Amino acid sequence: DVNEETFIILYDNWAKDKKHVWYQDKIIETADAVSFSVDKSGLPKDKDHVFVYDVDMSSFRPSYCNIDVASAEHFVYKGDGQDWTWIRDKDFVYHDETKLDVDRNTFAPLGETHWWTDKDCIYMDSWNSSLNKWEVIKVDSLQSPIDTLNAGSHYLRNGRNIIYLANVIVKDIEVYRFEEVGLSKCIVNDMLFNNGNRILKDSLNVSEAKFYFYGHIATDKNHVFYSRKQLNDIDAASFHQIDDEIFEDKYYIYTHYCPVKVDK
């Protein structure tokens, strides 16, 4: 039953009257209607509780964490909008209702990348399947310069270190080349990495290598590789691309990425 005289719209999908609070068409039974509000950050709260979305309930409930209600706020906004899983109060940052050991005042997403930083460290949020929850992992101490190849890249330069997702894969080197060459493929100086693992260490001359077909094909003047496999029947010196997925050497045309020989 709605009391029409006191019914008001609070925020997107939120409303209340003098006795009840609604999220969409569901009454939030645990909410104190008199004190309930949605603050300017979009965080629902009453005098005693912050309310968080529960996937299993498909609705909101009071948070289990001991968060300071008065100062609590959402603070993470990415390309697809507000992220409800991140909350901070005057002292701490919380992710999925877990208090984090980070610096509250400087903790923030690193642009649209996979990482987060505060004044001291780099972090990444990762799904822990055994606990069935997200965790925030400390990856490395924060260095300078910090550089991503692009917003979706899995690689991050952190000063003299190179990070792949939540792992430091190269430590304490002078970085003079940092370049993405394919899907999860990256060159660091004269080293080639795929999914964070160094590949073709003693096979490919990375400094002169060319990459084709989203990085699946790599060549130098003596070798042609598809992924990690050397293709010995291709003439590397004359091998080149002639269309999006078509290549040739002095003997054959190779179609798609298999490659399949087609006589000239």
Feature-to-residue mapping (PLM):
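Non-catalytic tandem-repeat scaffold regions and their flanking low-complexity/translocation tails
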Residues: 1-264
